[in-house]
Every structure is written in C-alpha cells, then in structure tokens.
C-alpha cells in the first residue's frame, strides 16, 4: 500500500496519484486509487472532484465500483476533516479503525493500493489523530508530493525531517510543471546538493515513475 500526501494543499497529489496508477496499470500492476476522506465537495452539483476522477480511472478495472466504495467520509466544507466533521456531522466522528479495515480489504484484490490523504501529513482527522497517524496505522509506504514553486526547499526539508524522525519508508517527489523554467535556476541547485549528501534523494515526479512504482511494490 502507498499513502500519498503532500507538502501542502494544491501541490498536485491527485494528478500525481492518477499518473502513477496509470503507469502501474500499463505495466500490468493492477492498481486502485482511494481517497477515504474528501472535503470541499458537493456530489450533487460537482462531478469532477478528486474522487470522481479516481472513480473514472478505477472503473477501467471494475465497472461496478461506486463513489462510496472508494471514499467513505465526504464533507462540503473545504477545511481539515476534523473541522468539517464537527460542523456537518458532529455526532459521527471519523473512525480511523474502520477506515483502515476498509482500505486494507482492497489489498486482497489489487496488486497496489494507492491511498490519497487530505492535505499534508499533519492535517487533523480527529482530536487525537492526523494523516500521518493514518499512514502509520496502515503500515503504508509514503510518497510526499511537493509543489515546484519558490519555498519548496523548506517544505521538502520539513517533511523529510518529520518522516526521517519516525524512521519511515518514504519518498519525496516534486511535481514539476512544464512551464516552470524558474525551478531549474532557483530550486534545483539546492535539491542537487541535498541529493549528493542524502541516502533518500528528492526526485522529480515526472522523471521517476518507474522508480516510484518499484518503491511502492518492494
């Protein structure tokens, strides 16, 4: 199982998760995309949320899948899951133990299960647990997606420090847009220096699909 998080919201988790799953499936690795918690959605009027896109891809493998099969807690408020849950369904806290059981059931059917978190690793799910806690309970490998803008160095290093301190199996990958010429002169020079000294280098997502698939499967 691979848990995909990000250095912050809007870093491109969903885009990268879909690209990686498409690559894996093209290589013969049956891969499903799950997003157990999604906020800021209205399924009545918006059929293009992250989970709707996941469902579209997943149905190439199993036409019987529904939205509720791959996303279990859905909230209209665009906020941390804890805040959305307390405002919209105060008497029904998110049950992470139930989440884990439902997510792990997919490992019986698929070669690779990709689980996308909401926001970054420290986003609260309950008063006691955050996204990192969920990944730890799942015993999943972790892929953190970074944006490619100014500030990515600090964001990547903070996540690297957090994950390294927990002695986890993780990779950090930069979601590099085609039109971001500034990245190569502003941020890449330090990333290259960091990688020379690190035994867990930061990679460019678009250039590393084969490596990331191998990481997820090992």
Swiss-Prot record:
EC number: 6.3.3.3
Chain residues that bind ATP: 10-15, 116-119, 176-177
Gene Ontology cellular component terms for the protein in this record: cytosol
Annotated residues for binding of Mg(2+): 14, 52, 116
Subunit structure: Homodimer.
Gene name tied to this protein: bioD
Keywords: ATP-binding, Biotin biosynthesis, Cytoplasm, Ligase, Magnesium, Metal-binding, Nucleotide-binding
Pathway terms, separated by semicolons: Cofactor biosynthesis; biotin biosynthesis; biotin from 7,8-diaminononanoate: step 1/2
Main localization (coarse): cytoplasm
Pfam families named among the record's database cross-references: AAA_26 (PF13500)
The protein's name: ATP-dependent dethiobiotin synthetase BioD
GO molecular function: ATP binding; dethiobiotin synthase activity; magnesium ion binding
Function: Catalyzes a mechanistically unusual reaction, the ATP-dependent insertion of CO2 between the N7 and N8 nitrogen atoms of 7,8-diaminopelargonic acid (DAPA, also called 7,8-diammoniononanoate) to form a ureido ring.
Sequence positions that bind substrate: 39
Catalytic activity: (7R,8S)-7,8-diammoniononanoate + CO2 + ATP = (4R,5S)-dethiobiotin + ADP + phosphate + 3 H(+)
GO terms of biological process kind: biotin biosynthetic process
Active site residues per record: 35
Cofactor(s) annotated in UniProt: Mg(2+)
Enzyme class, UniProt record, top EC level: ligase
Database matches in InterPro entries: DTB_synth_BioD (IPR004472), P-loop_NTPase (IPR027417)
Family: Belongs to the dethiobiotin synthetase family.
Cellular compartments annotated: Cytoplasm
């Amino acid at each position: 199982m691979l848990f995909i998080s990000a250095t912050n919201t809007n870093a491109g988790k969903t885009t990268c998760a879909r690209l990686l799953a498409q690559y894996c499936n093209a290589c013969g690795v049956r891969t499903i995309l799950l997003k157990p918690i999604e906020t800021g959605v209205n399924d009545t009027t918006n059929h293009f949320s992250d989970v709707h896109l996941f469902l579209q891809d997943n149905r190439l493998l199993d036409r019987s899948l529904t939205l509720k099969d791959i996303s279990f807690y859905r909230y209209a408020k665009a906020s941390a899951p804890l805040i959305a849950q307390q405002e919209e369904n105060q008497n029904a806290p998110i049950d992470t133990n139930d989440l884990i059981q439902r997510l792990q059931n997919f490992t019986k059917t698929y070669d690779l299960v990709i689980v996308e978190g909401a926001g970054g690793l420290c986003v609260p799910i309950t008063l006691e647990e955050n996204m990192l806690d969920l990944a730890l309970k799942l015993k999943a490998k972790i892929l953190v997606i970074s944006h490619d803008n100014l500030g990515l160095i600090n964001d990547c290093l903070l996540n690297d420090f957090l994950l390294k301190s927990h002695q986890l199996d993780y990779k950090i990958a930069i979601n590099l847009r085609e039109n971001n010429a500034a990245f190569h002169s502003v941020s890449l020079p330090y990333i290259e220096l960091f990688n020379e000294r690190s035994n867990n280098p930061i990679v460019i997502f678009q250039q590393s699909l084969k490596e990331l698939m191998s990481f997820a499967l090992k």
